[in-house]
Amino acid sequence: CQQWERADKKDHRLYAFALDEGRLYEASYKTLIAHEDKLNPGAFIASLSIPWGESKGDDDLGGYHLVWPRDMVNTATGLLAAGNSETPLRALMFLAAAQKADGGFYQNFWINGDPYWTGIQLDEVSFPVMLAWRLKRAGGLQGFDPYSMTMSAVAYLMLNGPITQQERWEEASGFSPSTLAANIAALTCAASFAAQAGDKVSAELIQDYADYLKCHLEQWTVTTRGELLPGVPEYFVRINPVKNVNAVEGLNAAELFINNRPASKQQIFEARNIVDAGFLELVRYGVYPADSALIRNSLKVVDAVLKVDTPKGPCWRRYNHDGYGQKADGGPFDGTGVGRAWPLLTGERGHYELAAGNDVTAYIKALEHFVSRGGTLPEQVWDTDDIPAAHLYKGGTTGAARPLAWAHAEYIKLLRSAADGRVFDQIPEVVNRYINAPQLCKLIEIWHMQWQTPKVRPNYTLRIIAGESFHLVLSRDAWQNSDDFPSKGTGIGVHYVDIPIGQATPGAQLLFTFHWIERNVWEGKNFTVKIAE
């Protein structure tokens, strides 16, 4: 009895902000607790369900019975919002143990830490860093030191970004607004960690990289030729698919392949005309203000393309032309289907509206109405005309995952945000740097093996970073002459050289190669960065 009472201890203030007498709050809290494995403390799976389980065979072992770092940290943060810091600490410790040697995290894994899918999602590297920061700020670390985990994670971000192999919908690679939002926030948290530890060099390097992402964000993820809403050509896209690290393709001309669509239907679309609401994460963490004209214009497009008004309240689809969901005839998703509306996106929109100073009652009420008969929130709801024979009703559950822990966490965080009068996930250090006292962009371009930026402008600094010490041998005149630059080390294992470009002639080339000091080997090939016009 005492053990259950400890697990059920939560912030009773939040009941006052529920509109259903606290039923969903109570159910959400217990649902999140139930998703922790009992033999592997801190291991939270995404859902106790198997989506469209009635159509699945024994060969589909994973289902949603896996740990996704993104879903898990959202679960832990939902519990933290409810006043529970002990369970989120177990989650952080589990993630620290599951972290890869290179600082990254697997896309998902079994509760014992063994990987299942091995894709790279850079937001999933960022989320554990933000959880560590939140627990530290809340005084909930209880002697556990996440510093090594945090620094390894941000070193991984710096050496493997800014292109993510997969974004939060796990289907596309490129520049993702939601991924970059998480990266910027996590890097800023880590810079704060390093500064507090007295490592000013690492703190500055980490923050410089966060600033670099922020200063390039619109160049990478905003179209100026969108066609989805007349009169609004400029908005954030879902993702800018980049095929070649050596040559960033212009977003306005890029094409995006969309998964889960039948071969008989169009599968390749112009990236500028595919949107989701992932850019709202920029407001959630404090990278952009809620009243940004670009954010507001992007919302106009999202509402015109993705919003669904159901009898139970407003809901949003993930992105246009999504194929992950119940089929049009009501049949189960079997590799193809139609993406339906996701209640967790109603919660995300509620957080934006709160940040904008608006009433969030409609979003709290909608989430409470989206619950199933068993009191749980689904991943998706039916978003078109009723099909009674298939038990599908507009605003009602589908065969998608139910419960979805992430959706329950989003509801709890929305209650907490309403109680506090500010977004619970907002990070003060991020707000201070990018909203309250915005910094001028440094004239810096970053190059590393996974991000071989092709150009640098006159009067900029080209910063070359690597995960080991090196000598950079560089020529500005086609190897008639060369200079040798030893790298500078940092406390996070990232080494770097800064090359001032000065008044270089546009069109000129920088040629360089590496001698790796510890291994005493030459890279064996040259690299080129051109001086931009």
Language model region names:
Residues 1-63, 426:
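Acidic/polar, glycine-enriched structural segments that form the non-catalytic walls/loops
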Residues 9, 15-24, 121-122, 178, ...:
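Extended ligand-binding clefts on enzyme/binding-domain cores
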Residues 13-22, 39-42, 79-92, 134-151, ...:
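Structural helix-adjacent loops and short alpha-helical linkers that scaffold large soluble proteins
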Residues 28-40, 83-106, 145-166, 208-228, ...:
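Long, well-ordered core segments of solenoidal/helical folds
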Residues 75, 118-135, 254-256, 269-289, ...:
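C-terminal capping/lid segments that line or modulate ligand- or cofactor-binding pockets
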Residues 426-533:
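Glycan-association/targeting regions that enable binding to alpha-glucans and other polysaccharides
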